[in-house]
Amino acid sequence: PTGPMHMGNARGGALGDCLAACLDWAGYDVTREFYINDAGNQIQKFGKSLAIRYLQLYKGEEAVPLPEECYQGADIIARAKEFAEIHGDSYVDKDFEELKDALIADALPKNIAGLQRDLGKYRITYDVWFHESDLHKSGAVDDVIKILMDKGACYKAEDGAIMYRSAQYASKYGVVNRKKDENADGEEEAKDEVLVRANGIPTYFAADIAYHYNKLAVRGFDRAIDIWGADHHGHVARMKGAMDAVGLDGTKLDVVLMQMVNLMRDGKPVRLL
């Protein structure tokens, strides 16, 4: 939740809520859950964007330019101004990481509240708002990596990174969107995937495995149904295979892919937030 609700959130919410309502009507015990990606690179980029916009309020845009890879939206400026209204310039000379963390802590709950408010306008409510960061804080990510290591699904590379034998487990579930290398004969070979980088930081895939392990093993759901954007189609077989790798049944995870759309006006795409 690095910004206001967009069309993908809205369409995914409607699709998931309709499916949940049908299953509920059919007699299933359904829990509606929203997964909050509040860890990883996107949140770090969110914090960096906020911090730069905050510093610009006091030093100017020329002194503190916003890189192109940062979030450029007006909502980022608005959140930075809200922070400044409370704290003034007291963070201008603080360590950049401290400033970034403070802004994330201030802005993220507001964005989540905004999502909840907007979803409520078309009568969608979730029973659980699950934070990705909790998986890291609780040690759940480390636990699932240990399970994979113990089962031989992972190994430690020469540089210290922990690698996962993805293709070995994903192949039974269909086409895998994976990185490839060319071997000596010029043919493509599937590469194993990084779960923990050489610097000790887990990848997003490690957290995803821990999250689905939490649903199926820790909380004991009989079936997990995810709503994903179609651009993540290559991740389906990987995640199902990962459930097998940790000793669960990958067929208990269903993924509904939601196609992406562009809204047009006068022949031009319309940007909606």
Region locations from a protein language model:
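NTP-dependent nucleotidyl-transfer catalytic core
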Residues: 1-273
